[in-house]
Amino acid sequence: PDFVVDTPQVVVEGPGEGHTLNPGEPGSIFDDAVDVTGVGQFYRADGFVCTGTLINPRTVLFAAHCVNDAGEDGFGAAVGNIPAAFAFQADALDGLRSWIRSGYSSVPEDYVYNIEQILFDPDSLARPEARGFLESDVALAALDTPASDVPTWAMLFSPLATPDSIDSVSGTGYDVRVVGYGRSGYGESGSFQGTDFRRRAAENVLGALASLNDRNEWLFGPGDYGLPQNLYQTDFDDPNGTNPFDFNLFRDGAR
């Protein structure tokens, strides 16, 4: 279906409906209650940004589509390639400035760490029409300095247990918190706001472990959609229940 856009977006209710993108306002989703959480902003000196999670003091897990256009050997300021770094403050702009001023070096006091090496799954490039998204979208970054003062996150390698039942309020029962940097917006408008280097967080319900083939076949009928990768998926529900495009794909209430 030509009108389905298969790219991740982070959107919330509009202002006056409980949430806002703006820091310092009631209902803000700016994630600054704890400044350094282990979720960080990825910078590339050629202008790209992404989000990653620190899984040990030297390693960040993030998405292959952030880097697979340049190749694994395309990064590293020390060898004359594209400089790249991760910064872990809630507002990562100061970290970016410190990194640039230092000549693309780690500045631990600002929680910004230069990247020494990047590895990504080459299968993320297997289908050019996917633009590096969806399949095998996994990369690892090795920091040149241990981020010893930054919390690390554990990894789950097994599927979540299948719920015994699903209801129209709590869905699967798996409440999740979505955290990251980058574009953001509201349900009616989509992700209209560009990157401002701030970390934001919102809650949702995990809807399904399923492929986009499964979704499309349910919506549009059988077809060769070419999207077999299983993904944990969420939907965005209109809190007022009036939007004609909100058909509550995963049978859970708005959060």
Predicted regions mapped to residue ranges:
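Protease-domain processing segments flanking chymotrypsin-fold serine proteases, especially trypsin-like
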Residues: 1-60, 70-83
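Conserved catalytic-core segment of clan PA serine endopeptidases
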Residues: 11-34, 76-168, 172, 179-185, ...
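Conserved catalytic motifs of the protein kinase core domain
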Residues: 57-59, 136, 174
